[in-house]
Amino acid sequence: MANFDFKETFLNPIFKGNPISVLVLGICSSLAVTVQLKGALVMGLSVIIVTGLSSLICSLLRNTIPNRIRIIVQLVVVAMMVILVDQVLKAYAYSISKTLSVYIGLIITNCIVMGRIEAFALGNKPFASLIDGIGNGVGYAMILVIVAFFRELLGSGTIFGFQVIPQAVYDFGYMNNGLMILPPMALILLGCIIWVQRSIQKDLQEK
């Protein structure tokens, strides 16, 4: 069991060990839910909740789970959290839930959630596991929000559905970039984020 450092455990997955831009995990949702900021933000918050609580519960159960069925137990715990989040969204934010459709359910198979349970929660105390799960969720959500910000702004001229580019700009001939709302642009923007991060953090560059 590693010594628990709150700052390192929480901040490392946001920056140096970001699950998307560094570990390249969970990138499918960067294609699916980043056309609009609202959907990306809700998806990010959902992953934060699921990852944090799943890591906490699995850490609490780590000494009682037989090794041969640990993956099954982890999947049950994650599925339970995902169903809970999905039902809350359907009850209180139905329009967003309908927009995200099956992608909330696919959190169950997200490599980040299962990866943190296997790599951290099963070998550390509950509070440390909770912080690690939340940190990884925040790192995931941050990338989604950045990608969605540029896709919505440049592709639709809006932020959270509100028009932010003045009509006068359009009158001068400006047009929204239709390419931004196409799925491939999410990967291109993600590639730009990875390039910028590795340009700043030299230790991430491959030798």
State each model region's role.
Residues 12, 59-63, 128-136:
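Short amphipathic alpha-helical coupling elements at transmembrane boundaries
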Residues 54-67, 114-124, 198:
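C-terminal ends of transmembrane helices
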Residues 25-31, 47-52, 79-86, 108-112, ...:
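Hydrophobic core segments of alpha-helical transmembrane domains in multi-pass membrane transport
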Residues 84-99:
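Transmembrane alpha-helix boundary signature
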